[in-house]
From Swiss-Prot:
Family stated for the protein in its record: Belongs to the DNA mismatch repair MutS family.
Domain of life, source organism: Bacteria
Native organism: Streptococcus pyogenes serotype M1
Lineage: Bacteria, Bacillati, Bacillota, Bacilli, Lactobacillales
Protein name from the UniProt record: DNA mismatch repair protein MutS
Keyword Transcription regulation: no
């Protein structure tokens, strides 16, 4: 960046840019925001705007690009969406009154995690995450600057940190420590996050609870410091810090949520086709955000779940009142975001009108809730603060037709301020007064064509042609002489003109001051507004769940302490909604106290994955307090759900299907408890047949013997069905089929016992493969099945069985005993649970060489 022969203005730019090297600097110059040097070159490419230079004739012209100030937000949005930061430098004084270079300062740094204004507003949360590490545990804090939500927790390991960042869908992560190279790669390359750094802790006793751990305090304090440093103002809308524990919610990884299509469809990345889409009958932006939060974090507290259920039941039982409630909620605007705009000093008249309209609806909403006459609903009603004094202030102060911008005037209602009313009367009636003066002087002077005109230089004046100069009255005074006429004024006209000019100038200034005063008054209500927002959002979500339950004929689930799963005629709620009730085939799911694993076999395309997802969605809906898609449901409370459903390679991180399978399986068996739910679909298909079968069997045995979690394990390894002989808590189920005249019909119903055939060739037939190919496949299958009849599948004892199984007559796995002894010794020293997937594969390869 050359600094030779630069102007004072450019020196000012360079001095400011030096403090913001990692951000695009938008430098206000008149009606444009300008960018210079490397910023200009890069912005011209990213924003598709023209690139020019400030001093074209110089030896080294300075690259320059600019955007109009009135449309700058859309360009800022593009840069933020691409993961960049933007520093906005404004003119801090009127250029006309400035001595020398106009004073400029950065007034805000906008980052992907601190977006408040946007040309394309989104109702979803935008969380900025901060992470700190004390050498033992991680502190993780997050904030939505646009709503003021502020939370913190502590986590045991980086895997949990990564999962929480993914669940929050953060775009920017603030770090208070140095990452390892592997962690840096994960966050930047795999998760595409913008990393920022902060060392200073912001201490605010009003926001941060002293009961937190040290690492939680530093994470939250550094987050606050970063937000204040970038926003450069006091933020009165920031809420008191809330501490939460991951264990207080049903734990699910981002991969699990994605595979279950909870908040967006994994295939389209759209809301349509997700559980969020199904359950969203909310009427407010606040309700939409809260619903998504409930889906992301189902509860584990039975008491809290039952409270939600009870209110939904009350709403279901009162259709008319619930309909009135839904209609009233339609008039509620986004109080959280409006409050933040007030706090940021960006609220315009339209924002205050929306706030006033919302407050006007609150008494009606409160009255409707009272009409339900229910103790559980009354708890919500008692906490509703209607803020009548604020509603009255806005209603009496802000003109209902006020423009969106403060500078246009016509903001304040007539009758609110006497001085403003006087000025408006002068402006409104002044033209009439001038017309009266014109008529009076025309008649008195006898100048028939006498008229009053106006221009900026001379103001109001009498226009008199040269032919009538002899008739000019004595009280006229000359203001200007033209070739064919003269311009005159009078004391009376000057007085009226002075009053009108004063009224115009003072009215605009006074109206601005009044609006600022009103906005400052509104800011004092922010805490009460935020509490009201939470209650209205909760009411909105509960009425939404009631509407969905009634529309789709859902039932109220029950919970037990017996570790029993009973789902009668259950449905996959989302698939049913897409297909239609008439087309969907329901399935019952049953786990008694003794059963921990269902091993499900059956052909592809027959409904195994849907059956598994059905159980997961039923659990999630039930534990978020929703009613569920079934005839009857009785569930234990789960603490976590682990899934491996789907076989897409993780191409971004360079991990194969098999590696992803093993990593997700490892997370499940390490973290699951006997109160967890595990869903594994076709685990082991990403490697060779015998490797896959061996690993699948070992994982099933491990879950059975050591974990005890309720598990559905879908497999195409039919040999694994023999495990039910030795594993007492495992039962076989299969997808039923109907064979008739050589054709196979998949019934999509789950039945007891193992499947007797794979029907893979029939699936290929449905897919339309050539007949000659199918015939050849059938011949090969027949030969393989014949060969397999003469080959015994060897049952390898698990670790809980006697190590002397070979001596008890079981077939030896190896041909000679010496080699078997060598392999047995190698196996005994392997610490499977502490091996990485790569180490496991290497060890397996070494063992294979011993055969």
């Amino acid at each position: 960046m050359a600094k030779t022969n630069i102007s004072p203005g450019m020196q000012q730019y360079l001095d400011i840019k030096k403090d913001y090297p990692d951000a695009f600097l938008l430098f206000r110059m008149g009606d444009f925001y300008e960018l210079f040097y490397e910023d200009a070159v890069k912005a011209a490419q990213l924003l598709e705007i023209g690139l020019t230079s400030r001093n074209k004739n110089a030896e080294n012209p300075i690259p320059m690009a600019g955007v109009p100030h009135h449309s700058a937000q859309q360009y800022i949005d593009v840069l933020i969406e691409l993961g960049y930061k933007v520093a906005v430098a404004e003119q801090m004084e009127d250029p006309k009154q400035a001595v020398g270079v106009v004073k400029r300062e950065v007034v805000q740094v906008i980052t992907p995690g601190t977006v408040v204004d946007s040309a394309k507003p989104d109702s979803a949360n935008n969380f900025l995450v901060a992470v700190d590490f004390d050498g033992c545990r991680y502190g993780l804090a997050y904030m939505d600057v646009s709503t003021g939500e502020f939370c913190v927790t502590d986590l045991a390991d980086f895997t949990s940190v990564r999962s929480e960042i993914q669940n929050l869908k953060a775009k920017e992560v603030l770090l208070g420590f140095d990452l390892s190279e592997e962690e840096q790669t994960i966050l930047v390359k795999q998760m595409n996050l913008l990393l920022s750094y902060e060392e200073t802790v912001y201490e605010d006793k009003s926001l941060i609870d002293g009961q937190l751990t040290t690492v939680e305090l530093t994470a939250a304090g550094k987050l606050l410091q970063y937000v204040h440093k970038t926003q450069m103002r006091e933020l009165s809308h920031l809420q008191a810090l809330v501490h939460y524990e991951i264990k207080d919610y049903l734990q699910m990884s981002y991969a699990t949520k994605s595979s279950l299509d909870l908040v967006e469809n994994a295939r389209t990345n759209k809301k349509h086709g997700s559980l969020y889409w199904l359950l969203d009958e909310t009427k407010t932006a606040m309700g939409m955000r809260l619903l998504r939060s409930w889906i992301d974090r189902p509860l584990v507290s039975k008491e809290a779940i039952l409270e939600r259920q009870e209110i939904i039941q009350v709403f279901l039982n009162a259709f008319i009142e619930r309909t009135d409630l839904s209609n009233s909620l339609k008039g509620v605007y986004d109080i959280e975001r409006l409050s933040s705009r007030v706090s940021f000093g960006k609220a315009n008249p339209k924002d205050l009108l929306q706030l006033g309209h919302t407050l006007a609806q609150v008494p009606y909403i409160k009255a409707i809730l009272e009409s339900f006459d229910s103790p559980c609903v009354d708890k919500l009603v008692n906490d509703i603060d209607s803020l009548p004094e604020l509603e009255y202030l806005i209603r009496t102060a802000i003109d209902p037709d006020a423009p969106a911008t403060i500078s246009e005037g016509s903001i304040i209602r007539n009758g609110f301020d006497e001085r403003l009313d006087h000025y408006r009367k002068v402006m409104r009636e002044g033209t009439g007064w001038i017309a009266d003066i014109e008529a009076k002087e025309r008649q008195a002077s006898g100048i028939n064509n006498l008229k009053i005109d106006y221009n900026k230089k001379d103001g109001y004046y009498f226009h008199v042609t040269n032919s009538n100069l002899s008739l000019v009255p004595e009280h006229f005074f000359r203001k200007a002489t033209l070739k064919n006429s003269e311009r005159y004024g009078t004391a009376e006209l000057a007085k009226i003109e002075g009053q009108m000019l004063e009224a115009r100038e003072e009215s605009s200034s006074l109206e601005y001051d009044i609006f600022m005063c009103i906005r400052a008054q509104v800011e004092t209500y922010i805490n009460r507004l935020q509490k009201l927002a939470k209650i209205l959002a909760t009411v909105d979500v509960l009425q939404s769940l009631a509407v969905v339950a009634e529309t789709n004929h859902y039932i109220r689930p029950q919970f037990n302490d017996n570790h029993v799963i009973t789902i009668q005629e259950g449905r996959h709620a989302v698939v049913e909604k897409v297909m239609g009730v008439q087309e969907y085939i329901p399935n019952s799911i049953s786990f008694d106290q003794q059963t921990s694993i269902q091993l499900i076999t059956g052909p592809n395309m027959s409904g195994k994955s849907t059956y598994m997802r059905q159980l997961a969605l039923t659990v999630i809906m039930a534990q978020m307090g929703s009613f569920v898609a079934a005839d009857h449901v009785d569930l234990p409370l789960f603490d976590a759900i682990f899934t491996r459903i789907g076989a897409a390679d993780d191409l971004i991180s360079g991990q194969s299907t098999f590696m992803v399978e093993m990593m997700e399986a490892n997370q499940a068996i390490k973290r699951a408890s006997d109160n967890s739910l595990i869903l594994f679909d076709e685990l082991g298909r990403g490697t060779a047949t015998y490797d896959g079968m061996a690993l699948a069997q070992a994982i099933i045995e491990y879950i059975h013997d050591r974990v005890g979690a309720k598990t559905i394990f879908a497999t195409h390894y039919h040999e694994l069905t023999d495990l039910s002989t030795n594993l007492t808590s495992l039962v076989n189920v299969h997808v039923a089929t109907l064979e008739k005249d050589g054709d196979v019909t998949f019934l999509h119903k789950i039945a007891e016992g193992p499947a007797d055939k794979s029907y893979g060739i029939h699936v290929a037939k449905i897919a339309g493969l050539p007949k000659s190919l199918l015939k050849r496949a059938d011949e090969v299958l027949t030969r393989l099945e014949t060969q397999s009849r003469s080959t015994e599948i060897i049952s390898v004892p698990s670790q809980v069985e006697s190590s002397s199984a070979v001596r008890q007559g079981q077939l030896s796995l190896f041909g000679d005993e010496e080699k078997a002894h060598e392999i047995r010794q190698a196996l005994e020293v392997i610490d499977v649970m502490n091996m990485t997937p790569l180490q496991a594969m290497t060890t397996l390869y070494e063992l294979k060489k011993l055969l």
